[in-house]
Amino acid sequence: MYTSYGEKAVTIKDATGKELTENRIVYEFVDQAFLQAYVKAWKFYAQATEGSDPKKQYLIIEEINRGNCAQIFGDLFQLLDRNGRGFSDYYIHADNDLKRHIYQKFQDNGVTFSEYHQKAIDAVYPKEEESVALRVLSGEILLLPNNLYIWATMNTSDQSLFPIDSAFKRRWDWKYRPIVKGRDEDGKELKWRIAADTKEYDWWSFLEKI
């Protein structure tokens, strides 16, 4: 989800002092949509002043059921359960490579928690012996802050796509969005039409039929 690779030239010398060049594959993290949103959300959280709400960060997933959600989300699935304060109920541990990468991203973006923020986060997890806030900053664990919103769309009528199991479904709030007539910036109805052979049909009437 986060890695890609590229070639890097490594120069070495043999016993005669002659330079030898060897091409090696070097793996490195390349931030994708989730990690970008994750770092931004914590940055906004850390920037919020005491008593104010942090700026909201949104991660938009279009047509979520076009892929296998269990495979796509992996361990992140556990982060979707939120507690009463909007944080993840459960955190997950990052492996050493991801831990170092997240820590560096936080450093690069100036993400650090004030005493107020640290206490606020730790208060959400009173049973933890170590500071959860500091473990988040170190990259050791991942958990979603209360200003990170994940919104997804899906077409429930399309049976050709991947089914979503009930355990995944219950971790979301669902809202039905019906098809509505298109309108321009002034609110006037867009009278779209489609052509088939020599005839034209009203687009909205076509949608209602199917």
Where does each model-flagged region fall?
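C-terminal regulatory/interaction module of P-loop NTP-utilizing enzymes
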Residues: 1-210
